[in-house]
A protein has these predicted regions:
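Charge-dense, helix-prone N-terminal extensions
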Residues: 1-168
Length: 168
């Protein structure tokens, strides 16, 4: 039995690019202004680093995520922006297998690792650039040599945690 992509929440590549961008901006607008600015700055830096990558967007219960992939499959993501009310991070889908001689990766699961991003400048640090290069090098399917990637809205959850920090 084939899965119905609409039921799974995937809007895949059927959405017009302008509509996908508008929807993505609405996801980002849910965050506090400082996190909106950070998400946009990190996205700009990652688009520059991976100009041919597809961007897979998820607005799920716990996190907003934007993955940079060689295909339309989440497992092919090299890195992702992951954001919640607690801040913004750079997630490595296969981070548990990456060399981390500087010990900057956080997380303890079998697969994913991440770093916290206080600013987009963190992406310029040598140890972060090394992790990104290692993640790209271990990708099963390399990024296309040419062309432009597309923005794909993969999943939107009706119920979500707040994207803004709660008042204390």
């Amino acid at each position: 039995m084939k899965r119905n992509p609409t039921k799974s929440g995937s809007q895949s590549s059927r959405m017009e690019p302008a509509d996908a961008e508008k929807q993505l901006q609405s996801f980002i607008a849910k965050f506090e202004p400082k996190n909106q600015t950070l998400i946009r700055a990190v996205r700009k830096a990652l688009r520059k680093r991976f100009p041919t990558a597809n961007e897979l967007a998820y607005d799920n219960y716990n996190f907003f995520a934007l993955g940079y992939c060689s295909t339309e499959r989440p497992a092919d993501c090299v890195v992702s922006i992951a954001a919640s009310a607690n801040g913004v991070g750079l997630s490595f889908y296969w981070g548990a297998t990456l060399p981390d001689p500087h010990g900057i990766l956080l997380g303890s699961g079998n697969q994913n690792r991440f770093i916290r991003l206080e600013s987009a400048k963190v992406l310029e640090r040598r140890e972060v650039l090394e992790l990104i290069a290692a993640a790209e090098a271990q990708a099963k399917i390399p990024m296309p040599a040419s062309g432009g990637g597309k923005l794909i809205i993969r999943s939107v959850s009706a119920k979500q945690k707040s994207r803004r920090a709660s008042a204390k």
